[in-house]
Design a protein with these regions (language model features):
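Extracellular disulfide-stabilized recognition modules
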Residues: 1-43, 112
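Intrinsically disordered, low-complexity regulatory regions enriched in Ser/Pro/Gly/Thr
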Residues: 9, 13-16, 37-39, 61-64, ...
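Conserved helix-loop-beta core of C-type lectin(-like) domains
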Residues: 15-17, 32-87, 127
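Short linear motifs in exposed loops
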Residues: 25, 92-93, 120
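Intrinsic disorder
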Residues: 25-28, 48-51, 102, 123
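Eukaryotic intrinsically disordered and solvent-exposed regulatory patches
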Residues: 56-57, 114-116
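Surface-exposed ligand-recognition segments of extracellular binding domains, strongest
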Residues: 66-105, 111-115
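Short, structured beta-strand segments at or near domain termini in extracellular proteins/domains
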Residues: 121-131
Length: 131
């Protein structure tokens, strides 16, 4: 793990928080493409569970200057957002008025202020993976 932290820590699109490493190479895709990319790399989509993790993802998001996908969604049960492992979200950072499910929005994007918005899963957003 120490070698991974050293390698990723030197990368532009990488941040380390505790035992987690967040990484992006600037690739964008829809939610399913992002999920597949992160899973195929041995990780999962970035899914902040506290403010420090959210800030790490925000730094990467802002380096690329585009909205980023987060791993949480309410695809299974509308209005019940969950982490990729199926557990309920324990940390919330919704933008005011969100989630609002405007237009069948089941996925979550991060704005440039670190706040979250529910978003249509078919839109393209920055892919950030968590290891």
């Amino acid at each position: 793990m120490a070698a991974l932290k050293k390698a990723f820590g030197a990368s532009k699109g990488a941040r380390i928080v505790g035992d987690k490493i967040y990484v992006s190479d600037g690739t964008q895709g829809n939610y399913n493409a992002a999920k597949s990319a992160c899973t195929n790399a041995g990780g999962q989509m970035a899914s902040p569970q506290n403010n420090d993790e959210n800030q790490a993802v925000l730094v990467i998001r802002n380096q690329y200057g585009v909205a980023a996908w987060l791993g949480m969604n309410d695809i299974v049960t509308e209005g019940s957002f969950r982490y990729p492992n199926g557990n309920p979200i324990i940390y919330l950072n919704w933008s005011p008025g969100e989630p609002n499910n405007l237009g069948d929005e089941d996925c979550v994007e991060m704005y440039d202020n670190g706040k979250w918005n529910d978003k249509s899963c078919g839109d393209n957003r920055l892919v950030i993976c968590e290891f």
